Amino acid sequence: MTKRLLILEDGTIFEGEPFGADIDVTGEIVFNTGMTGYQESITDQSYNGQILTFTYPLIGNYGINRDDYESISPTCKGVVVSEVSRLASNWRKQMTLDAFLKIKGIPGISGIDTRALTKIIRQHGTMKATMADDGDSIQHLKDQLRATVLPTNTIEQVSTKTAYPAPGIGKNIVLVDFGLKHSILREFSKRQCNITVVPFNITAEEVLQLNPDGLMLSNGPGNPEDLPEALDMIRGVQGKIPIFGICMGHQLFSLANGAKTCKMTFGHRGFNHAVREIATGRIDFTSQNHGYAVERSSLPDTLMVTHEDINDKTVEGVKHRDFPAFSVQFHPDAAPGPHDASYLFDEFLEMIDSWRCTSK
């Protein structure tokens, strides 16, 4: 059987068995520490352009089902596992992980020492990597990898091109799609909200023309500093309607208010990150997927830190002191992961009610 190679930017080479699509790819290699939820992770558009390493030793044992998609068209570049289950056993299963990746054109590699790989990423940071069959010249692959420039328009690639509705009978929410997870839509639909999903480059004027009760800024891939148009939109809407941001939305909200962001060494990607709510001391276990963070020292006086990561003190939430607006770095929608923080969707809707009363 043909072997598949995983070549890192620092020259490290791993050899494993191929599964999924039979193509060569290059992307940023990252790792996810979740024990389950591989379908949700692979279909999360926040992984656009990235080669996704799962640290859990066995992936694929319950297959792929019709319910757990976070997007219909996954855009991660590749999947790296220690062992892939070629058989899948679950009453909801539609197909195996191998079959799914073949259909979606995503290559996988198994038989990799993912512990050793994760240690390299933790020590040296995320880096470029190439997955290719071992019939290719290794030196040629290394030269190609070194010369590859990863794209920066990752959000443009995954955002909706046109606005579309998700009808409901409740509050009107404009949801900006920076790489939207379906679970965010589901959380608002549970609460009967009337949602309009809009492209990433919508203007403040266009948002306000939709007469929304609130603005939701979704998750998404890449560097938030690559979206100056989104910052202008947030500044134009802020103070006129309540705002809630998640993940990329959190970073954009912070940037729009004068804070700075920085690239993390290896990021937070997993489903068991403990976060403290500073006001109450409450601890929530959260789902996270981000490679950038808001710099605490850069926060203006108008923003207050509401949540922080217990382990490394990363800013995990902020709130505006003057306007009805807040954001969190983690995913209260979970999918996958714990639902400890799903109450934040209710707090956003309560904020809308309060704003209506005070702005009359």
From Swiss-Prot:
Residue numbers binding L-glutamine: 46, 220, 222, 248, 251, 289, 291-292
GO molecular function: ATP binding; carbamoyl-phosphate synthase (glutamine-hydrolyzing) activity; glutaminase activity
Superkingdom of this protein's organism: Bacteria
Chain segments carrying region CPSase: 1-169
Enzyme class: ligase
Keywords of this entry: Amino-acid biosynthesis, Arginine biosynthesis, ATP-binding, Glutamine amidotransferase, Ligase, Nucleotide-binding, Pyrimidine biosynthesis
Stretches assigned to the Glutamine amidotransferase type-1 domain: 172-358
Catalysed reactions, as listed in the record: hydrogencarbonate + L-glutamine + 2 ATP + H2O = carbamoyl phosphate + L-glutamate + 2 ADP + phosphate + 2 H(+)
Annotated catalytic residues: 247 (nucleophile), 331, 333
InterPro entries in alphabetical order: Anth_synth/Amidotransfase, CarbamoylP_synth_ssu, CarbamoylP_synth_ssu_N, CarbP_synth_ssu_N_sf, Class_I_gatase-like, CPSase_GATase1, GATASE
CDD domains tied to this protein: GATase1_CPSase (cd01744)
Signal peptide: none
Function: Small subunit of the glutamine-dependent carbamoyl phosphate synthetase (CPSase). CPSase catalyzes the formation of carbamoyl phosphate from the ammonia moiety of glutamine, carbonate, and phosphate donated by ATP, constituting the first step of 2 biosynthetic pathways, one leading to arginine and/or urea and the other to pyrimidine nucleotides. The small subunit (glutamine amidotransferase) binds and cleaves glutamine to supply the large subunit with the substrate ammonia.
NCBIfam families: CPSaseIIsmall (TIGR01368), PRK12838.1 (NF009475)
Assembly and binders: Composed of two chains; the small (or glutamine) chain promotes the hydrolysis of glutamine to ammonia, which is used by the large (or ammonia) chain to synthesize carbamoyl phosphate. Tetramer of heterodimers (alpha,beta)4.
Family membership: Belongs to the CarA family.
Name recorded for this polypeptide: Carbamoyl phosphate synthase small chain
Organism: Streptococcus pyogenes serotype M1
Lineage, opening ranks: Bacteria, Bacillati, Bacillota, Bacilli, Lactobacillales
